[in-house]
């Protein structure tokens, strides 16, 4: 099955100065349009800012802390989550992720805060753009959405589109592709996370960072308010990335260590293990013909039988708080885990080179123990089992100064920047 988002990435990577000039010309023209939208709002008698988060996957959502602040300021903000379908990976994935996403946000915020962007029974996509003043797009790829849920459609309406990363930018080629596509050059405001990402956006983006604000990584604000469960046993988080077959960003080593995972509970009976794969890992393995659905189901059955906790979607900061260490080959998890101050093992794909990853990812990996083989992973776990690691559990000065910008108040910074009625 063709992955439309991956095709968009590959298309954007191609050298195409004529297309880039067209995007720049349109982006430059949007400045006056956005100012007109703001002026119209200020001239209106409506003193509420109507805000929507367009979300297709609950695990790819970077606005929770901001949304929570809005919920507490009902005198200024009327906020909703609009569930939109991911149409890029086939109907079963579209249906299942939509249902799961809707259920998650209804439970998380309450059903009154959730709006449907898809009538599943009638199979009709619902245009709600004109109901809002500002729309946050959790997904930076229009190829994953239908037209009425896209950024390129939003800029033709009386609305201000904004973007916040749902994860740290770690893949250089994927970041480059987003910088050369229309979506993030067209948004009114693009809130970014670190000085590294800010500088790379200014260097790579077609409009050279004209719409970018360095605000910090709002997603991690929530971590400061999480209290883990009291426990008597050590717990290790295993996080596997989805890039099993992706030359643009060869992070995943899942095919190297997937059998090892199943054997860990017997090897280390005094440690609990949690398996938290990227939400796209198994769907991509199926679509790329790496595994069949039956093979995926069989593996997950073995995970359960081995006594490994399977974490599938939703928030994960409680896991960060509860776990004593992480084994991962992921992207943003690599940087997010640094907020905990706890030990980590990064499983390094031998195909990964500096040209594949962003500066902040390169710097983040340096803070990890590196595993090249299954034996290296086992050695790391032995150290955790034997208490051969620091117990400080707090971020160091480098993380605070370079990665955790405005932590734990990045959400307040973003909220202030979006308040067009000030």
Language-model features: locations:
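Conserved catalytic-core segment of nucleotide-activated headgroup transferases in glycan assembly
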Residues: 62-63, 72, 218-297, 403-412
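A nucleotide-sugar donor-handling region in carbohydrate enzymes
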Residues: 19-39, 165, 174, 178-256
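A donor-sugar binding/catalytic signature common to diverse glycosyltransferases
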Residues: 162, 312-356
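Catalytic donor nucleotide-activated moiety binding site of glycosyltransferases and closely related
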Residues: 82-86, 93-105, 265-312
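Non-catalytic N-terminal targeting/anchoring module and adjacent flexible stem/linker
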Residues: 1-56, 72, 422
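Active-site and donor-binding regions of nucleotide-sugar-utilizing enzymes
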Residues: 52-222
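Nucleotide-sugar donor-binding patch of glycosyltransferase catalytic domains
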Residues: 294, 342-387
């Amino acid at each position: 099955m063709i992955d439309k988002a991956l095709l968009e990435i590959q298309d954007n990577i191609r050298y195409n100065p004529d297309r880039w000039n067209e995007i720049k010309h349109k982006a430059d023209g949007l400045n006056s349009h956005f100012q007109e939208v703001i002026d119209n709002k200020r001239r209106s008698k409506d003193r509420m800012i109507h805000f929507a988060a367009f979300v297709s996957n609950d695990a790819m959502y970077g606005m929770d802390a901001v949304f929570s602040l809005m919920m507490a300021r009902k005198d200024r903000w009327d906020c909703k989550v609009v569930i939109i379908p991911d149409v890029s990976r086939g109907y079963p994935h579209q249906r299942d992720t939509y249902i799961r996403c809707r259920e998650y946000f209804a439970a998380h915020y309450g059903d009154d805060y959730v709006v449907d962007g898809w009538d599943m029974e009638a199979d009709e996509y619902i245009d709600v753009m004109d109901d809002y003043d500002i729309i946050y797009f959790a997904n930076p790829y229009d190829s994953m959405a239908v037209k009425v849920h896209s950024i390129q459609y939003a800029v033709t309406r009386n609305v201000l589109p904004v973007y916040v990363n749902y994860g740290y930018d770690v893949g250089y080629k994927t970041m480059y592709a987003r910088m050369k596509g229309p979506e993030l050059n067209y948004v009114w405001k693009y809130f970014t996370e670190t000085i590294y990402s800010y500088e790379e956006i200014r260097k790579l983006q077609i409009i050279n960072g004209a719409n970018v604000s360095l605000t910090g990584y709002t997603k991690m604000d929530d971590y400061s308010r999480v209290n883990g469960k009291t426990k008597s046993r050590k717990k290790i988080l295993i996080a596997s990335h989805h890039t099993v077959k992706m030359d643009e960003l060869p992070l995943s080593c899942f095919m190297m260590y997937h059998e090892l995972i199943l054997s860990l509970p017997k090897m280390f009976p005094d440690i609990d293990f949690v398996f938290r794969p990227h939400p796209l890992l198994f769907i991509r393995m199926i679509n790329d013909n790496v595994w069949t659905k039956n093979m995926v189901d069989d593996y997950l059955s073995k995970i359960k039988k081995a006594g490994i906790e399977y974490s599938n979607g939703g928030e994960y900061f409680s896991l960060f708080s509860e776990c004593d260490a992480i084994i991962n080959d992921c992207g943003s998890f690599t940087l997010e885990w640094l907020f905990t101050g706890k030990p980590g093992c990064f499983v390094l794909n031998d195909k990964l080179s500096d040209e594949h990853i962003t500066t902040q990812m390169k710097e983040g990996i340096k803070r990890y123990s590196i595993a090249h083989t299954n034996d290296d992973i086992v050695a790391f776990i032995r150290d955790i089992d034997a208490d051969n690691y620091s117990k400080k559990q707090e971020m160091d000065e480098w993380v605070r100064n370079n990665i955790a910008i405005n932590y734990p108040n990045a959400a307040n910074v973003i909220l202030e920047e979006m308040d067009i009625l000030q």
